[in-house]
Amino acid sequence: MEITSSAMLKTTTTPPHPLAGEKVPLSAFDRAAFDVFVPLVFAYRAPAPSSEAVKEGLRVAVAAYPLVSGRIAVDGQGRRRRRRVLHVNNEGVLVLDATVEVDLDAVLAANVATDLYPALPEHSFGAALLQVQLTRFGCGGLVVGLIGHHHVFDGHSMSTFCATWARAVRDSEAFIVPSPSLDRAITGVPRSPPAPVFDHRSIEFKVGNKSSDSSGAAAAAAVEKIANIGVRFTAKFVAELKARVGGRCSTFECVLAHAWKKITAARGLKPEEFTRVRVAVNCRRRANPPAPADLFGNMVLWAFPRLQVRRLLSSSYRDVVGAIRAAVARVDAEYIQSFVDYVEVADARGEELAATAAEPGETLCPDLEVDSWLGFRFHEMDLGTGPPAAVLSPDLPIEGLMILVPVGGDGGGVDLFVALADDHAQAFEQICYSLEEHAMIHSHL
């Protein structure tokens, strides 16, 4: 791997974008999101478009979404009320060019994205909020690896931005620049007076700075003990899961139910323990009034289906899906408004809110966290020569974190990427394709 160039891509628009120079406060949803850079890696077989065309399309897309070209900063309202903001200063998107002599097929076979996206910055302040690496392979293939800061966008927004970028490359001069909804303030309008009715202190936030007893070196050592594995559930396997559930059931629900059961079995947890899954829920349509579908930013809260290990392992797929569905349904308009009101009250009191999201090196066992990319518009990441041959999984630095990714091509299916302790990973790989709903319970009771 050789990095051949590194440059900041900046945009120029006439007249300037209305947000140019603004310091946009983070919304309540932004503040609850991970304070991390999230990698995303697309692989394209030859023939692939030129790097110049990909960069020009990126420039056009960034002009429509100027927040990604800014930087995280702190407002100047005094020490007690200092808040992070997105400074729309057009400092630029970092773009790296790289070459590697091996063929792309070797990378696709290994399904490893190491070194195929920019290194994750140690600090958010001053770092480019969107960074891109274009890696050319000896066979003519191309990998587009990017990292974006989660305070700028959630998965839905990242998917929309990437689809816009691809369309700009594909359509070139015929591309019509969109006008997405960039007003983050509409996501968090509190009642007057604000009246939170749920306890959000232990769910989305905790009061005070998030502390960690681990140094960076200790966190890195913990990450080394985590095994990143990937398993593919074919379209036929997913159909069999849905048949086990019976009735209406989404791909996400049935695959999550299956993974939750099998990972819990692989962990060998005590039957009286409880296990829960942190499930990201897109709140755009659930809010009252609903937010625009093209709202760019964060608008995600979390559901927490929770079951006792004994019950989870002995329950049918139908019952586990029911528990997941019931937990997600509780993230409704009333809950969303309560969350917004809670943040308003905490700010009025001068409380420092720290997100409860896990940090690299942390272990979630006996719990899990799932991010679903199944509804993302990856098929629209066609740069003009066809959709990606694969969406590669980045390293997952948190034990118990899993990602569901749609399989490209005609076959369909779902790729599950998960980080587990080494021995749990080995056990999971041995049972992950078993459809015996109660097969593992006898070893735990």
UniProtKB/Swiss-Prot annotation:
Gene this protein is translated from: TBT1
Pfam families to which the protein is assigned, alphabetical: Transferase (PF02458)
Entry function: Hydroxycinnamoyl transferase that catalyzes the transfer of an acyl from benzoyl-CoA to tryptamine, to produce benzoyl tryptamine. Serotonin and tyramine serve as acyl acceptors in vitro. Can use p-coumaroyl-CoA, and to a lesser extent caffeoyl-CoA, as acyl donors.
GO molecular function, one term: hydroxycinnamoyltransferase activity
Matches recorded under InterPro entries: CAT-like_dom_sf (IPR023213), Plant_Fungal_Acyltransferase (IPR050317)
Protein name listed in UniProt: Tryptamine benzoyltransferase 1
Key words of the record: Acyltransferase, Transferase
SUPFAM superfamilies: CoA-dependent acyltransferases (SSF52777)
Domain of life, source organism: Eukaryota
Enzyme's top EC category: transferase
Active-site positions on this chain: H150 (proton acceptor), D382 (proton acceptor)
Its EC number(s): 2.3.1.-
Family statement: Belongs to the plant acyltransferase family.
